């Protein structure tokens, strides 16, 4: 890892952010992290903690405080408003799109070595089959689903515009479904796993995605920082999988019975009831029309580019899922006595 750089990680307590931050800290790097919650910082970071700046991605004044010293800086921008539905459109746009623009704006007059924008495979235009080199990935917001997908696409547009108009040394890092230890935020798939273990998930659906281990990105982070080319896009993923496959690995480890699998049309029939339940309880729904659409998408993403340029290798999904469950137990997010 290049220790001559000062690393700035926005969203350093988030799922992706904390895993990458811990990797940098383990390598002895100088890391400055943007966070909003002191309580979460204490929960996420134990022995090693980055220099924390408490602030909001929507405030340029807060973001200016991240640039301590003269650099050179490597910015790893992970902040986004994550939602499996359309979400609060204003907050989605303000955090994910304008927040990215704010980070770009405050970086333009700094000594930036690399600006890594952590994006998502959800930003890929509907129906687009990526080339091996991702040269045909052109963010097209109106060809993505409204909500998180579209917001990430707009954010990608802002980054590429900054590359074109201001020579920002930025690259797009698209991530498929993130799994593995480190999810202190109870993201959607983690909640599905917890509900299954706790007996609150009555059935699975006949669909899948592409889930990979975020630790495998951390392992090649040094090569990403040094070798990612300005203006280019990279995708980290594994192979397409099924929800049943993930849950069966969970079940094998926790001695839980396999769930029945519902056809997709039944899942769609249940949407109004989930929406009503969400409104009554204030809890997020188990799934939405947007998340069901993702389960039907082609997720056979090309990995040749990251394998060749960064030495990336996706570990077996079963190993990732088991380690994910172990993490939940160790952090008391599930009760091990549920299955031991």
Feature-to-residue mapping (PLM):
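Conserved beta-loop-beta element that borders a ligand/cofactor-binding pocket
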Residues: 157-181
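NAD(P)H-binding glycine-rich loop region in Rossmannoid oxidoreductase-like domains
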Residues: 46, 51-98, 106
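Mid/C-terminal beta-alpha module of Rossmann-like enzyme folds, strongest
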Residues: 220-286, 303, 308, 316-340
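Conserved Rossmann-fold NAD(P)-dependent oxidoreductase catalytic core, especially the SDR/UDP-sugar
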Residues: 98-147
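Glycine/proline-rich active-site loop of Rossmann-fold NAD(P)-dependent oxidoreductases
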Residues: 166-168, 180-191, 224-234, 256-257
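Substrate-positioning beta->alpha
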Residues: 188, 205-225, 232
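Glycine-rich "substrate-gating" loop/helix at the edge of Rossmann-like oxidoreductase active sites
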Residues: 145-146, 176-185, 202-215
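N-terminal Rossmann NAD(P)H-binding glycine-rich loop of SDR-like oxidoreductase domains
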Residues: 6-27
């Amino acid at each position: 890892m290049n220790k001559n750089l000062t690393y700035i990680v926005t969203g350093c307590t988030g799922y992706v952010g904390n895993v990458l931050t811990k990797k940098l800290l383990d390598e002895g790097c100088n890391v400055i992290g943007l966070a909003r919650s002191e309580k979460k910082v204490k929960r996420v970071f134990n022995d090693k903690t980055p220099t924390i700046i408490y602030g909001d991605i929507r405030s340029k004044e807060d973001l200016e405080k991240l640039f301590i010293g003269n650099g050179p800086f490597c910015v790893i921008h992970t902040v986004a408003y994550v939602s499996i539905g359309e979400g609060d459109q204003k907050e989605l746009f303000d955090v994910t799109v304008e927040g990215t623009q704010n980070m770009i704006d405050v970086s333009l007059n700094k000594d930036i070595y690399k600006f890594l924008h952590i994006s998502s495979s959800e930003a890929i235009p509907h129906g687009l089959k990526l080339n091996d080199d991702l040269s045909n990935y052109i963010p097209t917001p109106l060809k993505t689903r409204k909500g998180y997908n579209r917001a990430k696409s707009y954010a990608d547009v802002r980054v590429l515009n900054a590359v074109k108009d201001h020579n920002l040394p930025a690259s797009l890092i698209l991530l498929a479904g993130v799994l593995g230890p480190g999810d202190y935020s109870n993201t959607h798939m983690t909640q599905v796993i917890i509900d299954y273990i706790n007996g609150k998930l009555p059935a699975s659906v006949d669909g899948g995605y592409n889930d990979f281990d975020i630790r495998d990105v951390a392992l090649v982070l040094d090569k990403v920082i040094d070798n990612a080319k300005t203006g280019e896009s990279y995708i980290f993923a594994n192979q397409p999988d099924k929800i049943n496959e993930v849950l069966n690995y969970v079940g094998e480890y926790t001695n839980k019975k396999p769930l029945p699998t519902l056809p997709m049309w039944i899942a769609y029939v249940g949407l109004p009831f989930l929406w009503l339940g969400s409104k009554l309880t204030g809890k997020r729904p188990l799934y939405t029309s947007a998340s069901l659409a993702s389960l039907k998408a082609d997720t056979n993403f090309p990995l040749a580019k990251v394998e060749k340029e960064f030495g990336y290798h996706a570990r077996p999904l079963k190993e990732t899922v088991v380690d994910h469950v172990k993490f939940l137990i160790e952090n008391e997010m599930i009760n091990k006595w549920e299955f031991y």
